[in-house]
Amino acid sequence: MRKALLLTFLSIIAFLQAFSQDGKSFVTLDNLHLNTRADFTLDYHPGHDTVAPSTDHGFAGKYLVVALDGTIGSKFSYHLRQRINAPNIGFANTFFQGTDWAYLNWNFTDNLFLSAGKQVVAIGGWEYDSNPIDIYYGTEFWNTVCCYEVGASLNYKDNAGKNHFLVQMCNSPFINQAMQSIYAYNLMWYGNFGVFKTAYSANMIEYQPGKFINYIALGNKLQFKGVEMYLDVINRASFEQDRFFGQDITAIYGIGVDIGKKWIVFAKAGYDFNQAQLPNTEAYDQYVTPGKKVDFESLGFEYYPLGDRSVRLHLCGSHTSVDGISKFQANLGLTWKVDLLHMKN
């Protein structure tokens, strides 16, 4: 079944590519990329109490992803990103569970459009907004959140390109079966003010019918020539808590510095904790669970041998502490991003 779906998917790509050869085509294919990454990872566990130190290591293919975008007439655009090597995510191991997004945009005007299909759950923050293939170490929240669900959003962009607002209703990322009747209600703002950019959201997400966990997610980014840094803060809370702020938090800081055209040196640190409830109680937050405390620090570099972003080598290391238990990790990997639409013979 999976092979048949994959062949159908590739046939659709070939069909769209054939249509895109004609400059007057009703359907266009504007972007077609194949992205993949493979890593060698070494974990060292120092040991604690009666547990002896241990080392684990091995090679792993991380991602194999096809992404395509195009237009249908003058009012519609389509967008698809498919993980060919999708893990068992969600409540059903199906080909569609490996679809990050598959949605249509309907442009009412130059400023207003409706988006419908499987799409990113609109939560603020620049770590959350990053392509997973570009994340080497993530927070506990990033590692556990389900990012993609079926739904719809109404979007507004101003003429200057400084503000993008969207309101979204979609399936709750906490669903574990079809037709579960729980939803997420999201309000998102992307701001672009020169060197300063925002990715802010307010979210009400059902984890059971009528029971909500609420997010206020503030993503802040500064971009200068050759330097990019961001600071994300996510506050999670239920209305049933005594204190709404400061009890269940994720904070992330990241910085990357270009060294010429081929090198980037980066550092990242993150911290998750949940003191909103006692452990072993019915959790309001099912991603960073009650009593959890996780922090990590990482440092590394990326090397682009061709001078563009199509081939990347990375080497980085990290220290992670989960509820006081440490782990050290080294990661060496290769990423390549192939533009299939503009390949030359």
Q: Where do the language-model regions lie?
A:
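Bacterial Sec-dependent N-terminal signal peptides
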Residues: 1-24
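Hydrophobic alpha-helical membrane context
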Residues: 14-15, 86, 333
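Phosphate/oxyanion-binding loops and surfaces in catalytic or ligand/nucleic-acid-binding neighborhoods
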Residues: 15, 111, 341
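Outer membrane beta-barrel
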Residues: 23-44, 55-172, 181, 190-192, ...
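Membrane-embedded beta-strand positions in outer-membrane beta-barrel channels/transporters
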Residues: 35, 63-65, 101-103, 151-153, ...
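Outer-membrane beta-barrel pore domains
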Residues: 39-54, 90-92, 107, 127, ...
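A structural signal for well-ordered alpha-helical scaffolds and beta->alpha junctions
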Residues: 147-148, 156, 182, 213, ...
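Loop-centered beta-sheet repeat module
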Residues: 165-214
